[in-house]
Amino acid sequence: MTHPAKARGATTRSNGFTLIELMIVVAIIGILAAIAIPAYQNYVVRAQVTEGLNMLGHAKTRVQESYFNRGEAPATRAAAGLSANPTDSSGKYVTSVDVNNGVLVVTFGYEANAAIAGLTLTMTPYETTGTGVVWRCGAAAVPGGGAQLMGTAGGGNTAVYIAPTVPSQYLPASCRP
């Protein structure tokens, strides 16, 4: 015996998704990807910049020690007590850490994201009354009451604007102008 619905010529509904439903799902995934991918790429670049800042720790200590021992900022890496070759301080995304008249210069290599590859970021030492040496990252504000260390780029106690070549959107808040 046949089923009554089939006998009358009724159509059967197929199970599964229609083409329209699948296209809607693909469109939603595309929209989410368009939002998520740039945010993730920005996060990756910021992490690479952070590596560069972290690599400055040892050099900052050496510049401070040299300043307190000699009364002026070291002109070179060797004067700061570091190896003379800037590429000796390198990492996965950083090709060199240099000392240029007391100012630390991080250069990002070509393993880094294309947005920062080949660019630099600077840290400038300042002396403040009561707190010793503080560091100015890139184009951030000069520390309150801070005067540049004797012997740093710009000479004497003048404030110098040392702009990083890394776009500010990738810098930590402490490094932004």
List each language-model region with its residue ranges:
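Membrane-proximal N-terminal amphipathic helix
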Residues: 45-74
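Alpha-helical hydrophobic helix detector
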Residues: 23-36
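N-terminal leader/signal peptides at the extreme start of proteins
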Residues: 1-20
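A short tyrosine-centered beta-strand micro-motif
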Residues: 40-43
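Amphipathic alpha-helical protein-protein interaction surfaces
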Residues: 28, 45-48, 102
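Periplasmic/extracellular, small/polar-rich flexible segments of pilin-like filament-forming proteins
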Residues: 68-177
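Internal alpha-helical transmembrane segments of multi-pass membrane proteins, especially GPCRs
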Residues: 20-24, 45
